[in-house]
């Protein structure tokens, strides 16, 4: 092939252009080298995604990005994580404030909960950062569609998540669409095919594998540890995770059966969880009550949560039906040590919170969501 033809092919490749800062200012010296590299890249990009694993420092990177870009910025975070941002900002000398609505804005940088975004005039912000942006993965959801539409003209956009596509690689399309890189439909048409007549089963085309990941690398950076960018992993290697399995025997037959059988389908697993609540709660309560250390107890059913709260005297319970004020107060109280035990569901309190003071947790059974298990 001639040089001219190679140049022609290069121009035909799909690479999203940078739209951010032509030159990046000096960054906070408290950032680790891998964090500084990622922030500089995201500032040059303008619309970028930081898909960094848990513990890599997405919070400081998001705040530094927000601080160094030139516009008013709003950061959206899960419940109680917003207040965590404020505490972290103080450590890094970043002027950031929490607000519940438009009237509460006092700084150039504002952090709020996802649930409260509709209380703001979003067109006044020139920058937005989504913490735990995997919230966008449910493309058919009205909220995801609203988010994409609300920020489609915002010049600086940042997505951050350790699990951007926990179920299927095609979920990356909603992140790309939010950032204005490419719509989900365009991504599927260009890089994906579906098997047979089931259009929900998409996979990357064999010949498009390299092109797809090259395109991804033009707008997203993905790392699991600093050495992925050539830096030392010192301080980022977590201690080994010790998992202890406690088996609860169930002898009573499930509904519709003459005797107890192994749960195979989703419906059978759900029935087994409901039928064994009492035994599982009792086993967990014995374990937690015999300890004097901070403890996180994860459950999936409201009945489990209520039974656990009754069986563990010094626990605070966080349910989905609670007010936002109660949820925030309970989670912050657990973080501050006012409560030794917190009982909640991974989908409520399992995303984004830094709970390093608590080394012990119990799962009163597991759901079918790997993302919830990994994040919590």
Regions found by a protein language model. Name each.
Residues 80-103, 179-182:
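Conserved helix-turn-beta segment of the N-terminal RecA-like "Helicase ATP-binding" lobe
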Residues 59-64, 70-92, 166-171, 300-302:
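Conserved Walker A/P-loop ATP-binding site and its immediately adjacent core
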Residues 70-73, 91, 127, 135, ...:
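Conserved P-loop NTPase motor "coupling/switch" region that bridges the ATPase
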Residues 296-298, 306-309, 313-349, 372:
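Conserved helicase ATPase core of P-loop NTP-dependent helicases/translocases
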Residues 268, 272-300:
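Conserved interdomain hinge at the start of the Helicase C-terminal
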Residues 45-65:
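Walker A/P-loop
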Residues 369-376:
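Conserved SF2 helicase motif VI
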Residues 9-51:
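Conserved pre-motif I regulatory segment
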